[in-house]
Amino acid sequence: MEIACIHIGLMKTATTYMQGVWALDEKIALSNKGLNPVVEYLRESTAGNRFDAGKNLNIDLDQPLKAGQSLVLSNEGLSCGFLDSGDAEMLRIYQDNASIMMGTLASQTQNVLITFRSPVSWIHSMHAQFLNEGGSGSASEFLSERRAFLLQCLDLDYLLGLYRRYFRNVRILPYEALREGEDDFWASLGEIFNMPVPTVRDVPASNPSLSGQRLYVLSCLNGLGGHMRSVLQHSESYVGMEQERLVQVSSHYESWLNRRFVEHASEAELEQTLGWLRADTVPDDFRRFSISREFADELEKRYLSVVEEVTGDTKLVSRYRDELQQAITEPV
């Protein structure tokens, strides 16, 4: 089975939209959900220190392959995991393990795609994703607590080195090119990978993006639930099977309940919730953060200089650097 390309993310670089385009285009056969068992194995085996490089790689397609279709593998879980724990060293090992598993497909393709974006806007999106997955806290707290993890996510120098061990045609393309000139983006992708250019553009959103008051309420609810679980988990008066089961079940379902609530609650219901939480308004700095010079220097070494060297797009990288400089000067 010949593969047109393997798309590994980065996370929060319009991967869901791209997968939607590929899924709806008649010329493309997509494996996205079909890769979820692979991603789950990578996460569990990496965390448990039992990764087997010789494990058979079974990939399912999201829909049956039709004659003449080109196969695309796309899952951002191949480049990022452990957002909940923020374990940078575990992520580094995970990325290596993922590249080893994908490397077994080198006889079926030499094409790997990594999409990237401005680090400042990416951090904002990662903070929102962290809240969507059950986390809590401001953007500034998120950056402070997960600095090493975020740098590892953006370590393009490391990722490119991993995949170039197995694949000859590893390419990087910017998120901004897709957002600012979609037709040209798909045409460029078709040219560099010799694959069909999709014509689908009207892709329904799989999950609504949250912002402002809704995102803040989500953070508060997640934080409250986490506090309650922690108290019960360490309680000396409430012990036994019921306690263990309750903590486990609530951890699994609570983030979904909170997420769906803030998606579907009316404005009045959100205001009422804020009142119960004794938080009448969203703090002005909830979604703002500043970047240290040290953090910016690391991004320059691992990310910006790599993008500039590989793409030659000095104008785009200059834009990224300007945004970083602004984030050093004042909260963004």
Please place each PLM-identified region on the residue numbering.
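Anion-recognition interface
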Residues: 1-332
